[in-house]
């Protein structure tokens, strides 16, 4: 099993998208890229901790590659906006790829460059590519949020 960590705006929708992908074993939403140890949603919402709402993915590379997960990421959000996605604004909603090893870093750089050259967007890609730091899981009520909403209906 391999691990991938991405940020692409509000983590609820990102988790919903990745949880449906064949080869994804598990997803967990949380916070990464910041300075505060064990941040809460309230902490991260201030925009002062440096954390991004993110998703930690465990996947089976014999079923889906890291490169294919990057394609899902690019199609899940607008990578040309800085610190915002849709109605959500602030550095906690930034677009980022948190790589876990050199192979992931290289794949992310290549993928971002290919997307830039594709002409799909008029603006430049703002997605950060940074070394993964500690991932802190979000509170339970954030986990599988959209799935929980479906069960309540």
From Swiss-Prot:
InterPro entries: Met_Sox_Rdtase_MsrA_dom, Met_Sox_Rdtase_MsrA_sf. It comes from Methanococcoides burtonii (strain DSM 6242 / NBRC 107633 / OCM 468 / ACE-M). Belongs to the MsrA Met sulfoxide reductase family. It catalyses: L-methionyl-[protein] + [thioredoxin]-disulfide + H2O = L-methionyl-(S)-S-oxide-[protein] + [thioredoxin]-dithiol; [thioredoxin]-disulfide + L-methionine + H2O = L-methionine (S)-S-oxide + [thioredoxin]-dithiol. This is Peptide methionine sulfoxide reductase MsrA. PANTHER family: PEPTIDE METHIONINE SULFOXIDE REDUCTASE (PTHR43774), PEPTIDE METHIONINE SULFOXIDE REDUCTASE MSRA 2 (PTHR43774:SF1). Keywords: Oxidoreductase. GO terms for molecular function: L-methionine:thioredoxin-disulfide S-oxidoreductase activity; peptide-methionine (S)-S-oxide reductase activity. GO terms for biological process: protein modification process. Has an important function as a repair enzyme for proteins that have been inactivated by oxidation. Catalyzes the reversible oxidation-reduction of methionine sulfoxide in proteins to methionine. It is an enzyme of class 1 (oxidoreductase). NCBIfam families: msrA. Its EC number is 1.8.4.11. Pfam families: PMSR. Gene3D superfamilies: Peptide methionine sulphoxide reductase MsrA. The active site is at residue 10.
